[in-house]
Amino acid sequence: MTDLEKHVNRPGRDKQVKKVREKINELGITYIYYQFISVTGRVVGKGIPADHWERTAEKGFQLVYGATANLFLDRHNNYIGYGPEAMELVGIPDPETFCQLPWDKRVGRVFVTCFRNREERNNPGGHLTSDCRGNLRIFMDEFQKKHGLELRVGTEPEMMWLTKNDDGTPTGKGFSKPFCYHIDQFE
C-alpha cells in the first residue's frame, strides 16, 4: 500500500469526510480552496466546486510539482525544483482542517497533504518531500513514537509598518514595504 493509499484509508477519515459534507450543505458552501504551503511559506493550491468534495477527498487533485516552489524560475529561466516534463503531484485533503472562510461564506478551505503521482516510476504515491506541512506531521509522529512526547510548534508572527485605506485594508505603503526580510527594508 502506498503512502497516499494509507493516508486516504486512515481509521476514521471516512467519517470526517462525511462530516465535512454535512458542514458544506449546512453552511451553503459552493466552492473549496484546497491549500498547501510552498517551500517559501506561501499558501498555494487549487479551487474546486464543493459538489466534488467526496471524489476529491478520495482521489485528490493533481497540480504541477513546481507549485511547491511557487513556479519560480532560476537565473537560467528553468523552473526551480521540477522541470516542465515532470508529472503532477497529488493533493489529498485533510478533512479535519476544513472550515468556512469568514470573508466569503460561500467558500471553504481545507489543507492537503501532497504525494508523488500515482504513475511515477520511482516511489509512486509516496510522500512528496517538498510538502512542508506533510513533512512536519511525519516528523511529529516519528518524534512521538521514539520519545513518547508531543512535539510543540508555533508560529513566529512578523511585523511590518503599513498604513491603511479608509476601509481598513492595507495600502501597501507606509514606514516599510510589505516584504518581510527583503534587504531593501534595511535602507
Description of each model-found segment:
Residues 1-187:
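Glycine-rich, acidic/polar active-site loops that bind/position phosphate-bearing ligands
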